[in-house]
Amino acid sequence: MYKGLLTLLLLFTCFARAQVVDTWQFANPQQQQQALNIASQLRCPQCQNQNLLESNAPVAVSMRHQVYSMVAEGKSEVEIIGWMTERYGDFVRYNPPLTGQTLVLWALPVVLLLLMALILWRVRAKR
């Protein structure tokens, strides 16, 4: 009796860590590569530092399936990323475009670097 229960317990614990694998059929390997490339460029809105391929969050799974279906429909990378950006905002892009809202993000490092160079130059000039 105990051997049977122990066997069942071991059998069920072997599969306790199994995860759902996301499978999707593509017409050709190029479409699959395009879909994986696009999904790796988009950030999960729920998981701050994971792309759509790495995240298992429900929103990432939904977005990943949307990318796959749009690739299967023949949409281009620009169209898919544009659609995702329109729906979820610039946050989903790892490389946000240069706009009025993101100008501070792009310019701040340069301004800080120039400011530090100016401070160092003035300190050395006084010596």
UniProtKB/Swiss-Prot annotation:
GO cellular component: periplasmic space; plasma membrane
Subcellular compartments: Periplasm
Keyword Signal: yes
CDD domains noted in UniProt: CcmH_N
Signal sequence extent: 1-27
Cited InterPro entries: C-type_cytochrome_biogenesis, CcmH/CycL/Ccl2/NrfF_N, CcmH/CycL/NrfF/Ccl2_sf, For-dep_Cytc_NO2Rdtase_NrfF
Keywords in alphabetical order: Heme, Iron, Metal-binding, Periplasm, Signal
Broad class of where this protein is predominantly found: periplasm
Record has tRNA processing as a keyword: no
GO MF terms held by the record: metal ion binding
Binding site for heme: 44, 47
NCBIfam families xrefs: cyt_nit_nrfF
Record family assignment: Belongs to the CcmH/CycL/Ccl2/NrfF family.
Role of this protein: Not required for the biosynthesis of any of the c-type cytochromes. Possible subunit of a heme lyase.
Name listed for the protein in its UniProt record: Formate-dependent nitrite reductase complex subunit NrfF
Annotated source species: Escherichia coli O157:H7
Top-level taxonomy: Bacteria, Pseudomonadati, Pseudomonadota, Gammaproteobacteria, Enterobacterales
